[in-house]
Amino acid sequence: MKNNIVIITGITASGKSELCDNLIEKYGNISIINCDSKQVYEEIPIITAQPPKQEVFYKLYGYVSAKENYSVGLWLEDLEKEVNHALENAQIPIITGGSGLYISSLIKGLSSMPQISQKVRKNVSELRKNLSKEEFYKLALSKDPRIQGKVFMNDSHRLSRALEVITETGKSIFVWQENRQPPLFNNFKIYTILPKREDVYRKINSRFITMIENGAIDEVKKLLSMNLAPHLPAMKAHGVPEIIKYLKGEITLDEAIQIAQTNTRHYAKRQYTWFKKQFLNAEVIDCANKLKIF
């Protein structure tokens, strides 16, 4: 291959994992490397749809404690080791996942983002909890007008991050993002899977029910038993906040399932818009089965 590093990305539930399974069956000289910010956590393999641990072809899955505030910078360090190891062993590295920040940092270089104090993080978290979505959005917009048209009301995670940065530093998050380090690699080919939304939404709904049946509730019980801070990334994985509310008796299980499905569909919708605009050099396909890599 001219480009000896492959990136397979796309929205959640687009078929990335199934495609990688098929590639493993068909070829023996590949290494599948995770690019999903929640699939790194050891305690939540079911609710984050991680591949089986015994699968030797898969790297950077389920190897970080949920106690850790794992970052894109740490992931890039781990990724570099795995990619170089694969290349040294005549394997083709296939980096796959849907975390936009991870992929953007890999392709464009890591932004020099500031450290956020626990005080600011806690204050923003309280605001996010106590304000309505509209109120929280208006607050963030009043502090950082540059988010208009770039960060939207339903994207509470990115709104929180923007508010944290402007509060901590007095500078817009977009000012920080403009200052990037050089990318780790430039010899890659990127594929983006963007299926029909209706198909993705159906898969999201059925997949979450399967996760519940396979033990997702027990995973969340374990997280609660660890007394983790609510701002930690593992506590924000899709489905975790909704199951926590169910376990605390605030909502029924049916309500938790419905809310988690709805929130994940909204996330997929935002991903769809983001991926269409971000990687103009990517080969875009609407079905994982149509992807021809080799």
Curated annotation (Swiss-Prot):
This is tRNA dimethylallyltransferase. The record marks S99, R128 as: Interaction with substrate tRNA. It catalyses: adenosine(37) in tRNA + dimethylallyl diphosphate = N(6)-dimethylallyladenosine(37) in tRNA + diphosphate. Substrate binds at T12, A13, S14, G15, K16, S17. GO terms for molecular function: ATP binding; tRNA dimethylallyltransferase activity. It comes from the Bacteria. ATP binds at G10, I11, T12, A13, S14, G15, K16, S17. Its EC number is 2.5.1.75. Catalyzes the transfer of a dimethylallyl group onto the adenine at position 37 in tRNAs that read codons beginning with uridine, leading to the formation of N6-(dimethylallyl)adenosine (i(6)A). Transmembrane segments: none annotated. Belongs to the IPP transferase family. NCBIfam families: miaA.
